C-alpha cells in the first residue's frame, strides 16, 4: 500500500498565532471601513459613498463572524474580496498606490494568504496536510513571493 506524502503538521501554537494575526488583519480592515463610512458621512454630502462604506463594513463583519467559526470557504471569500477591492480602488476610483501603500497591501495580502491556510488546518477535521500547510520558512517565502507577484498586479490602474 502506498501512503500519501504527509509532511509534519505545524504545531497548534503556530497555527493559533497565525490565526490570531489573520483575525487582527480582518479587524483592521473592518475598522478602516467603519472610519471611511464615518468620514464619508461627515465630509462628503452624497448619500451613496457612506452607504457603500457601511455595506462593505457589514460584509466584512459577516465574513469575520464566519472566519471566527473557522469556515474555510469564507476565508477564501475574504481573500477574493480583498483582491477585488484593491482592483476597484485602483481602476474605478483611480487611487494612486505609492510605495508605502503597496507595502501595506503586500503585508495584508501575505497575512490573508497565511490566515486562509491556517483556517483550513484549524477546521475540523483538516482533510490533508499539504506542503503549504506546514508554514515553515519555505512556505512563508512562497506566500511572500505570491504576495509580491500579486501586489503590483492588483494595485495598478489599468483603465487610465
Model-derived segments and their meaning:
Residues 1-160:
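Topology signature of small-to-medium multi-pass alpha-helical membrane proteins
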Amino acid at each position: 500500500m502506498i501512503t500519501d506524502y504527509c509532511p509534519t503538521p505545524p504545531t497548534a501554537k503556530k497555527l493559533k498565532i497565525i490565526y490570531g494575526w489573520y483575525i487582527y488583519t480582518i479587524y483592521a480592515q473592518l475598522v478602516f471601513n467603519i472610519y471611511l463610512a464615518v468620514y464619508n458621512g461627515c465630509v462628503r454630502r452624497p448619500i451613496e459613498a457612506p452607504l457603500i462604506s457601511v455595506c462593505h463594513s457589514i460584509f466584512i463583519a459577516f465574513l469575520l463572524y464566519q472566519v471566527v467559526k473557522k469556515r474555510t470557504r469564507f476565508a477564501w471569500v475574504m481573500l477574493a474580496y480583498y483582491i477585488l477591492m484593491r482592483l476597484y480602488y485602483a481602476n474605478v476610483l483611480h487611487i494612486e498606490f505609492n510605495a508605502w501603500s503597496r507595502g501595506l497591501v503586500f503585508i495584508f495580502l501575505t497575512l490573508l494568504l497565511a490566515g486562509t491556510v491556517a483556517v483550513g488546518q484549524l477546521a475540523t477535521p483538516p482533510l490533508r496536510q499539504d506542503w503549504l500547510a506546514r508554514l515553515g520558512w519555505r512556505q512563508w517565502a512562497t506566500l511572500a513571493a505570491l504576495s509580491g507577484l500579486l501586489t503590483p498586479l492588483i494595485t495598478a490602474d489599468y483603465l487610465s
